[in-house]
């Protein structure tokens, strides 16, 4: 399992530290002794539950969010008023009132009412935002998520309870919802099937739009910021070259993490917004106090009558960055964003727009550049140059929201198995949502630099800007209405009311921006289409691979027929007090119970005479003294499928009929806490097969995934079979936690080659050219795109630390075959 794979399972599930007994009933058949006791709360469980933010943290995060989220929406006053289409070349007082009125109501309805009061309350999932979060929330509620994936936020039994299961009726069932056909239209199976496809499409399309916006926003912001230098120095002609350098620097500093970057940028945006407030108040008081009339919707309606819906293509630039704000929830939290935007950013921007309107009414000639002309003191004053510098810096910072948004949604897509397993770096111990993805950062940097070189100047980019953002608004509204209906089970009238209020406005904004397609808006649409196709292809290929994994898992009873009717082995525990050195050899049962070591009830079957079903019939399974640890890429199989073993294990025992006397199936999980205490890191559960165990090794999201000799000893000292092995190897009391154990250990990793179905047999022969073409494309995509990328992210045992090369070659084994999907 690679570092990136470890982060895929980054999820916060409650874990109990049981060192005494597990209640013996039909759900929990394993127990340490006959006495029942209540599970004790572990440190891990307490840390998982302690996620509430103090007011001090809220205020600090709110301030930090200024430097990461509001640069885009906060710099809109630079260009919005002069981007709006007016009925006359020289707008009248009513025209200016109308423009400000449209900006005010657009901002209030979309940003405040829709996102702050509705979407941020209903659409977040497990502390994350964006369309992926809404999708995950709906999929979790309807149980229609990707097969074999734990959706963040799902209530689930503890690792300990899951390891304790010996029987399950769902090992080979999909996670689809079993609906009663008579339960009404809302839960009709056909409708649910449509909903599952619709929300996945919406999720992928919305993410693709954000990613394409991630190419345009940095390009727009940096080009416009550097072009501003020409106002002070008209002879400056190196806008493109300087912009490329600034962009490269901007992406280079992302490795320091959103925590440091946002806190560094926050004072700049804070001063910028303060400057907007001062400038706005000054212009209102001095030039036209009656500008507050523009807050009446009458003037917005009048401007729409005279100019049509094309007004929205310019006015919507005042709300760019809103969708990125929603995607960035994981970096700062919902409440800090809501408070900062509502109480500070929103008033500052509205006051600034009112001030610009007041100035233009008295100075119509200033419409070409209303922001700089309306700065108190006039051009070349010291206030002008202060605001000029702040405007340049703030505009550069504006791209930060989209960059962080791309990191957030990519991280969520990886966790849902909808994206290649890129390495995720958590940059904060306190907040799991603050992530940095190096590969995405460098790919985004290359894409943005190429986009900047292609568009060359800010005017060309601005002409292409806006369509993707308005489509994103529409996608979010569609998903949030499904969320209202199926997650919150609200009356159908509520989503209908929501649709009547917001959808017409968003559809109008989309229509008003369609004219931009010929002026460059085709580019974000094209990039969205490319991203959409890749996400859909990856999800399709991964679903085929997961289905194949489930299909090829082997039932224990089929592999070992004599175990079909055997009772389960008994205990599952975690390693309590793991910091103390202990030897299992010569220890009494009472001592083992005290240390929380697994105590399986040995089956009546003779461990050395177990028969295995092979292609040659039943054969005796021979066991030699030693230990094998087989690593699974996902803990899902290890936890949720106690009746089965991986296909590669079946191949091993049925082909060679000889395995080590102790066999451990091991998986690694990453929890949504920064660190896991050493005494709660490892959980061991016995299996039906004598001498076989299931093991979960747990890490926090800030910890390096590393298995060394000491951790191996932690695992081995919890297995009773180690007692007999230690005696055979004359170890006596030497196999203790503080020293490396010398019992031979073989580490087995699954390494398969993914290939497309061959379709070469007679039953698959066809003369249909379309079918042949489809199969050829399928083969190219799977064999030459999916398979190489998938192989790059397989673990290959990188997390297993063996310093000596010769020892590594002896102790690591890679088993697999060709997997056809």
UniProtKB/Swiss-Prot annotation:
The keyword Signal does not apply. It is a multi-pass membrane protein. Residues 1-47 are annotated as: Disordered. Residues 17-27 have a biased composition (Low complexity). Its main location: membrane. The keyword Transmembrane applies. Pfam families: K_trans, K_trans_C. Keywords: Glycoprotein, Ion transport, Membrane, Potassium, Potassium transport, Transmembrane, Transmembrane helix, Transport. It comes from the Eukaryota. GO terms for molecular function: potassium ion transmembrane transporter activity. Residues 1-57, 123-190, 260, 328-340, 408-434, 485-491, 538-821 are cytoplasmic. GO terms for cellular component: membrane. InterPro entries: K+_transporter, K_trans_C, K_trans_N. Residues 1-10 have a biased composition (Polar residues). The chain crosses the membrane at residues 58-78, 102-122, 191-211, 239-259, 261-281, 307-327, 341-361, 387-407, 435-455, 464-484, 492-512, 517-537. It is found in: Membrane. Residues 79-101, 212-238, 282-306, 362-386, 456-463, 513-516 are extracellular. Glycans are attached at residue 460. Belongs to the HAK/KUP transporter (TC 2.A.72) family. NCBIfam families: kup (TIGR00794). Major high-affinity potassium uptake protein. This is High affinity potassium transporter. The lineage of its organism: Eukaryota, Fungi, Dikarya, Ascomycota, Saccharomycotina. The gene is HAK1.
